Amino acid sequence: MGMIHIENRQKNQKIAVETLEKVAQRILNDSECPDAELSLLIVDDIEIQQINRDYLQRDKPTNVISFAMQEGEDVGLHPGLLGDVIISADTAARDAREADLPFESELYFLLLHGVLHLLGYDHERGTEEDARRMEAREAELFARIREEFL
């Protein structure tokens, strides 16, 4: 089983941390990296905007940010460490309301999306085929999450 560290630094949304950890482990298991180490940070819009501005030069809140440890200078330093996923609970709640979905559904989807980025999937900088591949993998894994946790 992997090492999953979850820190909930926001107060606006109720988060079932134990369930979120189980969802994260399911994602790691289904991605064939059950022993990987993952850090998950749940924040509000103010904090994610600061992170987005400071690290990605985008001065606005966003739903999820991923920082992979197996990229750039850090490759090979900690082979089991996937990286960090940061989710804005405020944006997730807003997006869930707009889509008429439960908050947990959006939260689990964003966790999955972030982990797939850590595993090298890319829908932004890659080709259309890369985006389709990521979307297909998301659909496949999220169907399993829905079945088990929602």
UniProtKB/Swiss-Prot annotation:
It is found in: Cytoplasm. GO terms for cellular component: cytoplasm. SUPFAM superfamilies: Metalloproteases ('zincins'), catalytic domain. Pfam families: YbeY. Binds 1 zinc ion. Its main location: cytoplasm. Its EC number is 3.1.-.-. Keywords: Cytoplasm, Endonuclease, Hydrolase, Metal-binding, Nuclease, Ribosome biogenesis, rRNA processing, Zinc. It comes from the Bacteria. One of its GO terms (molecular function) is zinc ion binding. PROSITE patterns: UPF0054 (PS01306). Belongs to the endoribonuclease YbeY family. This is Endoribonuclease YbeY. It comes from Syntrophotalea carbinolica (strain DSM 2380 / NBRC 103641 / GraBd1). The lineage of its organism: Bacteria, Pseudomonadati, Thermodesulfobacteriota, Desulfuromonadia, Desulfuromonadales.
